[in-house]
């Protein structure tokens, strides 16, 4: 679990390797991540957009930008949370993701809420000695 908080907006990310969606022989490793966004502040906010920085095990950077998350632009009142799960394929068995959500207050002010950097790693496979 990875956590960051910006201006009362808490972002918690829990990643996991999805073996059944992966094909190591084809250099395809699929990871899922669940994000929980909680408004610990006093103002109602709306998540407007996302910006991800995805870096694979070779150091190749991919940036992803878009409106909302999973097709939604949730509005969070004080004390409210929103969770979603999404996924990311990588050509390597490890990598990292990080980014920001653009949040807007009711009065139109925008700010960037930090998405903590988190690791994407295939769990170590047990080695069998013969």
From Swiss-Prot:
Residue ranges of domain ApaG in the record: 3-127
Domain of life, source organism: Bacteria
Gene Ontology biological process: error-free translesion synthesis
Gene3D superfamilies to which the protein is assigned, alphabetical: ApaG domain (2.60.40.1470)
Disulfide linkage: none
Coiled-coil residue windows: none
Alphabetical list of SUPFAM superfamilies matching this protein: ApaG-like
HAMAP family named among the record's database cross-references: ApaG
Record NCBIfam families: PRK05461.1
Name the UniProt record assigns to this protein: Protein ApaG
Record organism: Methylobacterium nodulans (strain LMG 21967 / CNCM I-2342 / ORS 2060)
Gene: apaG
């Amino acid at each position: 679990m990875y956590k960051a908080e910006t201006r009362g907006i808490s972002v918690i990310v829990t990643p996991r390797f999805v073996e059944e969606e992966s094909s190591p022989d084809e250099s395809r490793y699929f990871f899922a991540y669940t994000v929980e966004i909680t408004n610990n502040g006093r103002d109602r906010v709306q998540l407007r957009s996302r910006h991800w920085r995805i870096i694979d095990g070779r150091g190749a950077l991919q940036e992803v930008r878009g409106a909302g998350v999973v097709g939604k632009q949730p509005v969070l009142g004080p004390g409210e949370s929103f969770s979603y799960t999404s996924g990311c394929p990588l050509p390597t068995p490890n990598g990292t993701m990080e980014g920001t959500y653009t949040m807007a207050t009711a009065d139109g002010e925008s700010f960037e809420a930090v998405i903590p950097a988190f690791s994407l790693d295939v769990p170590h496979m047990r080695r069998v000695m013969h």
